[in-house]
Amino acid sequence: MGCSSSSTKTRRSDTSLRAALIIQNWYRGYKARLKARQHYALTIFQSIEYADEQGQMQLSTFFSFMLENYTHIHKEELELRNQSLESEQDMRDRWDYVDSIDVPDSYNGPRLQFPLTCTDIDLLLEAFKEQQILHAHYVLEVLFETKKVLKQMPNFTHIQTSPSKEVTICGDLHGKLDDLFLIFYKNGLPSERNPYVFNGDFVDRGKNSIEILMILCVSFLVYPNDLHLNRGNHEDFMMNLRYGFTKEILHKYKLHGKRILQILEEFYAWLPIGTIVDNEILVIHGGISETTDLNLLHRVERNKMKSVLIPPTETNRDHDTDSKHNKVGVTFNAHGRIKTNGSPTEHLTEHEWEQIIDILWSDPRGKNGCFPNTCRGGGCYFGPDVTSKILNKYQLKMLIRSHECKPEGYEICHDGKVVTIFSASNYYEEGSNRGAYIKLCSGTTPRFFQYQVTKATCFQPLRQRVDTMENSAIKILRERVISRKSDLTRAFQLQDHRKSGKLSVSQWAFCMENILGLNLPWRSLSSNLVNIDQNGNVEYMSSFQNIRIEKPVQEAHSTLVETLYRYRSDLEIIFNAIDTDHSGLISVEEFRAMWKLFSSHYNVHIDDSQVNKLANIMDLNKDGSIDFNEFLKAFYVVHRYEDLMKPDVTNLG
């Protein structure tokens, strides 16, 4: 009997162990599938983000093209607003920007006292936690005072650490004020004993960019030797037009917003472009290339880099009498080439410009070599060999950079020689990623600190968080798909030799990759985007189900509507450049002239009669003017309500 009892217990124990192993294996598989879905969603967000940045960089070639061809398209003297070509001599003095703006007694927000002290930092933090707005007078004064100090600084700040004085490196914040509050809560406020480096991209995307900028600038003015600011690719007035900071300023400072934007352009240009810690760690926003020349970058006149979208122009030194001037000091000669009013020394050389672009825009890759950053459209991809070459050349040990969202807030690559740090948590969607910062001390290994701003969604189970993130990613991907409906339909039909309305998943994926230019796992995504029949074939017109572009003018041709929707961000920037008085209005003739240039440069094939008809319809009161910004807002995507509300039964894994 004793043996029988022992045998039974053994069998039960074996059964329990097998059951535990089955559950464990199932759970591991479940977690792996969730992680795969999360990875696919992040890939969608990142691919679309980089494609938008590529479009933004392509605007630089358009602006050059526009200036070179402007007189050929439109013989009358149209006025262009080009902030980057205004000289500082044309800027009004401090009185016009700061002292002429009174702070009324009725203002209940924070009142700063210059010269600033740590009390002002505390005052500002408490006010912003209460969602108060800093008066425009103080915003302008802070920017003026910060610019004054920045102008005295070198291109690269050199700092030293010690066992009793670590330095904290923060990456992109992108207007995420709660992340900055959390960093200061966990790590302490900036001080002589607690120095910080903020590695660019303070602004854009998030809704509190001006608050972050004011906290950083005030802290910098109080501790100029202990808080260090590096320029990122979003510290650029042209980037701000697309990614939200310009709109934030104009919304919060309706009366004085334009003045703030003008000063910001100069402020950005004077930001240092890098920091070197203990003579061995290079801290820059983007990365390097095989031709990165730190000696040149130490010497370059950084304030000449107003915007990455305004590349160096061809300076014609001949005194051509047959020339045409516009409002901003640009001269077109008889051949349509650009001349600038002033000496060539007022502008960066092309080589200098490319050097700065590389350190602001480049990304590391695992593959050796250096090749164009085709995803972003600017900078390059650099491999481990390039990292070793540049670090060895300048006797450095490590490169710390930001510029890329990472799921854990940081990433180490290139045999530990390159570290990416990203400080904006929940960047794409609630729960999408952690933020992180680094603490450095001479002779020790970098220490990483992770965090995540917690809101209601962050307390949800992982499955629900992944569902939310996945649904959001698929939604923006569908919006990209519908903007190319005509092109995709033609591509599908070319593959559909039997005219069946169906393609193999491989054929469908080939069309999506080819037309949209997004490097995504289309086969894996197919179950979320299209209907697949029992034989595994894609009903390709279902790519456009449950979504449409709402068009404000019903008479407009669908191809024109798709084109306007697809390029709406680019067009908004271009037409804001024409709107010299910020009225929001442009003339019908300006619209037609600039559309010709735009369609020619972007190879957009739209019949002129459609554009002329649309221009006339847009001129609602027939006064010859178009409220173009309002018109563009009218083009938006409508998702079918039921589709957004029903629970998601498919997944990306």
From Swiss-Prot:
Has the keyword Ribonucleoprotein been applied to this entry?
A: no
**Cofactor notes:** Binds 2 manganese ions per subunit.
* TM ranges: none
Q: Which residues form the active site?
A: H234 (proton donor)
Any idea which GO molecular function terms this record carries?
A: calcium ion binding; iron ion binding; manganese ion binding; protein serine/threonine phosphatase activity
Q: What is one GO biological process annotated to this record?
A: detection of stimulus involved in sensory perception
| Ranges where the record places region Catalytic | 121-455
InterPro entries the record matches: Calcineurin-like_PHP_ApaH, EF-hand-dom_pair, EF_Hand_1_Ca_BS, EF_hand_dom, IQ_motif_EF-hand-BS, Metallo-depent_PP-like, PPP_dom, PPP_phosphatase
- Per UniProt, Mn(2+) 2 binds at D201, N233, H285, H403
Name the GO cellular-component terms: cytosol; nucleus
Activity control, as annotated, is: Activated by calcium.
- Required co-factors: Mn(2+); Mg(2+)
- Which reaction is catalysed here? O-phospho-L-seryl-[protein] + H2O = L-seryl-[protein] + phosphate; O-phospho-L-threonyl-[protein] + H2O = L-threonyl-[protein] + phosphate
Tissues and organs where the protein is expressed, per its UniProt entry: Also found in fetal brain.
Gene3D superfamilies attached to this UniProt entry:
3.60.21.10, EF-hand (1.10.238.10)
The name of this protein is Serine/threonine-protein phosphatase with EF-hands 1
Q: Taxonomic lineage per UniProt?
A: Eukaryota, Metazoa, Chordata, Craniata, Vertebrata
